[in-house]
Swiss-Prot record:
CDD domains: PSAT_like. This is Phosphoserine aminotransferase. Its main location: cytoplasm. Binds 1 pyridoxal phosphate per subunit. The lineage of its organism: Bacteria, Pseudomonadati, Pseudomonadota, Gammaproteobacteria, Enterobacterales. InterPro entries: Aminotrans_V_dom (IPR000192), Aminotrans_V_PyrdxlP_BS (IPR020578), Pser_aminoTfrase (IPR022278), PyrdxlP-dep_Trfase (IPR015424), PyrdxlP-dep_Trfase_major (IPR015421), PyrdxlP-dep_Trfase_small (IPR015422). It comes from Escherichia coli O157:H7. Keywords: Amino-acid biosynthesis, Aminotransferase, Cytoplasm, Pyridoxal phosphate, Pyridoxine biosynthesis, Serine biosynthesis, Transferase. The gene is serC. Belongs to the class-V pyridoxal-phosphate-dependent aminotransferase family. SerC subfamily. Homodimer.
Length: 362
């Protein structure tokens, strides 16, 4: 079978080594004669999976001891509700920074539970889309927290600055598409959440990192399944968790540790992004309309100068083993999502195809 490179934005490509191990263990996991999908989540075998996954995740991100790690349901959209329901406390407003599609989606959901103070950080610089630097973000004095999204998958926009708003500002961040791709200082955040289906594992699992002093503030109307305190008190097993997704994510964490951890991923991700953006920037045939300072390393949208060639580009790239390159319907064009599991070899295959396609159709 020819090598296939999956550039989907999520559910995304998983490491080949992880898939092979899961395949080998599918019908006989740990010598039990059953699949990990069939064992009790409260049995000692799966408890070990859960404990190892949390330990490895903490190691990868150097999560401080005063932070809890929760393995949840509901995806990023579930957390759009969970964040205000858990950490508003007795306040009624929160600061939300709008830099793209997913930040705006979080704002829309938050309006059900509080009055968001929305700061529009989107700007245009020399005709390119960009984000105002954090020093220009206007925050209110009475907000329970400040929320932003460091990486916008649809817009291809990244905010790589580390927040530094003082110890009194609780920062909540949607890291769904950039978690584990580069080192982060967890201590600068009150809440970090990430849907698993991009850089962690398969869809169905969501990881939350929450500072322990923020527990115990949930609104009385908060569903138990979204209550951080209840999840923490029950070891993330208030109800039956997505065990297979948890197991696979644990395998991904071990794969990451065996391959140099987050620091090594950071280097490789930079190489991949430079290679792909380099081909785009050195061509009049392709274009990207995001300012270099805010370009995402995870999601690279690009357009062809002649959109009439879009269909042919997608057909030929698919035939060449380069899958899921169609851009989001909101933006159009193409989009290459190059998360941790995408090897440099895959990006090289894409850029070689792009150069050859331009040669034939430019």
């Amino acid at each position: 079978m020819a090598q296939i490179f999956n550039f989907s934005s999520g559910p995304a490509m998983l490491p080949v080594e992880v898939l092979k191990q899961a395949q080998q263990e599918l019908r006989d996991w740990n010598g039990l004669g059953t699949s990990v999908m069939e064992v009790s989540h409260r049995g000692k075998e799966f408890i070990q999976v859960a404990e190892e996954a949390e330990k490895d995740f903490r190691d990868l991100l150097n999560v401080p001891s005063n932070y809890k790690v929760l393995f949840c349901h509901g995806g990023g959209r579930g957390q759009f509700a969970a964040v205000p329901l858990n950490i508003l406390g007795d306040k009624t407003t929160a600061d939300y920074v709008d830099a793209g599609y997913w930040a705006a989606s979080a704002i829309k959901e938050a309006k059900k539970y509080c009055t968001p103070n929305v700061f529009d950080a989107k700007v245009t610089v020399d005709g390119l889309r960009a984000v105002k630097p954090m020093r220009e973000w206007q925050l209110s004095d009475n907000a329970a927290y400040m929320h932003y999204c460091p990486n916008e998958t649809i817009d291809g926009i990244a905010i790589d600055e580390t927040p530094d708003f003082g110890k009194d500002v609780v920062v909540a961040a949607d890291f769904s598409s950039t978690i584990l791709s580069r080192p982060i200082d967890v201590s600068r955040y009150g809440v970090i959440y990430a849907g698993a289906q991009k850089n962690i594992g398969p869809a169905g699992l969501t990881i939350v990192i929450v500072r322990e002093d923020l527990l115990g503030k949930a609104n009385v109307a908060c569903p138990s399944i979204l209550d951080y305190s209840i999840l923490n008190d029950n070891g993330s097993m208030f109800n039956t968790p997505p065990t297979f997704a948890w197991y696979l994510s644990g395998l991904v964490f071990k794969w990451l540790k065996a391959n140099g951890g987050v620091a090594e991923m950071d280097k490789i991700n930079q190489q991949k992004a430079e290679l792909l953006y380099g081909v785009i920037d050195n061509s009049d045939f392709y274009r990207n309309d995001v300012a270099k300072a805010n370009r995402s390393r995870m999601n690279v949208p690009f357009q062809l100068a002649d959109s009439a060639l879009d269909k042919l580009f997608l057909e030929e790239s698919f035939a060449a083993g380069l899958h899921a390159l169609k851009g989001h319907r909101v933006v159009g064009g193409m989009r290459a999502s190059i998360y941790n599991a995408m090897p440099l070899e895959g990006v090289k295959a894409l850029t070689d195809f792009m150069v050859e396609f331009e040669r034939r159709h430019g």
